[in-house]
Amino acid sequence: MVGGAELSASFPMSSDRSKHTAHLLIFLTVLIDLIGFGILIPILQPFAAKFGASDMQAMWLMGIYSLMQFFFSPVLGRWSDRIGRRPVIIASLVGSMLGYLIIAQAENPVLSMNGKLSLLLLFAARVVTGICGASFSTAQAYLADITAPEKRAGVMGMIGAAFGLGFVLGPVIGGLTSDTRFGPSLPFYIAAAMSLLNALFCWKSLPETLPPEKRGEVRAKVSILGTMRRMGHTHFPAVLLSNFLVIMAFSVMTATFVIWAGKELHYSQRQIGLLFGFIGIIAILIQGGLIRRIAKNGNEAKLALGGAVAMVVSLALLPWGAVLSVLLGVMALMSVGNSLTTPTLNTLASRCGTVQTQGETMGAMSGAGSLGRFFGPFIGGWVMEIAPGRYECAFWLAAVFMAAAVVAILRIRPVVVAGADGK
């Protein structure tokens, strides 16, 4: 790992211009990472099938990314508390570039002669990109470093907007560029190029936010459970549980929705992509702008609660979305709920830690989210397997998970309203 001193910033963070530059670069870091992830959504499974991957292996190929994020988010977050945010972000971008290049090499004529070797390369590359994608928590900690607590909801909303935009642009880029005369590897080269360019931009212009005197020591063992124990006196365990349940419920829905919309509603892949784009656009509008205006110090838990309730209702109503107008209304409500809940939970989490533990705190949040994204598709698939054709069962189970998140969020509310920052 590169030392923080070697990657020190060339200008201080005290100026507004420096902060605006940092906000933009972190936004681009998250956006490019999500575009790189989204590019793979429509093409990874058929790409892996070329090398003999079964449906279950393809599912693991998708899930292992989130699993690596789960294990390494707290680790990278804690390392960023020790050596600084900047070196972790830059090294992760370079690692992501290498991971995408490895995936592209699976199409190499020499390697592709051995399907098992190519498949092994794909798994190795997904492990690398998953580990490097765990730096999302460091990006959140970076923003928390330079943002006053009462303004963090708006900044976390900006990160949510990058998520939404990445999920809109990624699948579109992947679908369009994979079907060209350049071959199916082109999307992976594009993702690698975007990661490299962003790494260069960050190297040149991203300042460090954590001076040496404020850095903590790296603990020998970092884990989500350990972080929860150290912060058990705050509302962090309830925030962490809420985050896990919200993301898992949403992941159950997305995994089931693609199959349900295709088989039951007879939508094409293009139409399904447009529906997810519709969700993403609403997320951009809310998390990129509206959340800044409505989130105030002390009301974040109320917004998270309202968003979670909206998601419970929308998930429960989703099976009645055979009529397009109803479906659009339900999905709009779901996107609004998710866009209110996610950034406010991250804001609440950021207030639980000290300056020295922001990376570890946000790393635990990111890791819990990754675990939710790992389990969600498998739970959705398991429900569809034991109840064939009963897609509503998966949606209703997701609503149950979301209702559990509502209960968890209610445990946060009194602490925040009382005026504590969770400390």
List PLM regions with ranges.
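A membrane-interface helix-boundary motif in multi-pass transporters
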Residues: 179-193, 382-402
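Short amphipathic helix-loop junctions that connect adjacent transmembrane helices
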Residues: 42-56, 255-271
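C-terminal transmembrane helical hairpin of 12-TM major facilitator-type secondary transporters
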Residues: 301-345
